[in-house]
Design a protein with these regions (language model features):
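Conserved phosphate-binding loops in nucleotide/dinucleotide-binding enzymes
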Residues: 1-18, 69-74, 163-175
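Catalytic adenosine-cofactor/nucleotide-binding cores of aminoacyl-tRNA synthetases and other
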Residues: 1-43, 143-148
Length: 178
């Protein structure tokens, strides 16, 4: 009722708000740590890199298949778990050592490249569910040479076949032990 000026709120609304805030803050972290960045390919230079790239490859498979099978609840759950638990809670935390002042410049650059690649791919996978937020953030990311999409909505999808090169069951098992 517009006359009562009540806020729309529910546990799911609060969870969605918290997730969007997490996406925004993680993106701001990555964007705020790109001093000296030059585009380049993602490389599994560390066990954490191998793990997150492998997890991203699996996510792309599950999301692509889930969308094709209209399993939107599973897709949303997979995206949330990857972004919040794996990318934010683990990989960003692992990356901080390489991003510190005084860290090895080559390790810093590769960490930056991997952060940008994973964030870019995650935003592409999240885009069907969160188009406005993901578009605004994606437009701020540095893009690889040859990326000719002017907007995320027309950018290429992170195809499972393309990301399959990152699959690494051993790296996933190693990080699970941490």
């Amino acid at each position: 009722d517009p006359e009562t000026h009540e806020l729309i709120s529910s546990p799911r609304t609060e969870q969605a708000r918290a997730f969007v805030t997490k996406i925004w803050n993680a993106s701001r972290f990555v964007l705020g740590n790109l001093e000296g960045f030059t585009p380049g390919e993602p490389v599994a230079a560390t066990p954490a890199d191998a793990w997150i790239l492998s997890r991203l490859a699996g996510l792309s498979e599950r999301v692509t298949q889930g969308i094709s099978e209209y399993k939107f609840g599973e897709v949303a759950s997979d995206l949330h778990a990857f972004f919040w638990n794996e990318f934010c809670d683990w990989y960003i935390e692992f990356s901080k050592a390489s991003l510190r002042e005084g860290a090895d410049p080559a390790a810093r650059l590769q960490t930056q490249r991997n952060l940008v690649f994973v964030l870019d791919s995650a935003l592409r996978l999240l885009h069907p569910a969160l188009p406005f937020v993901t578009e605004a953030l994606w437009e701020q990311l540095p893009h690889a040479e040859g990326e000719d999409a002017e907007a995320l909505m027309v950018a290429t999808w992170p195809e499972p076949e393309t990301l399959a090169r990152f699959k690494n069951a051993e790296a996933e098992r190693a990080i699970e032990l941490v």
